[in-house]
């Protein structure tokens, strides 16, 4: 996704 708060930040 590319979100900083996202644990699956790819």
UniProtKB/Swiss-Prot annotation:
Protein name per UniProt: Unknown protein 2
Organism of origin: Daucus carota
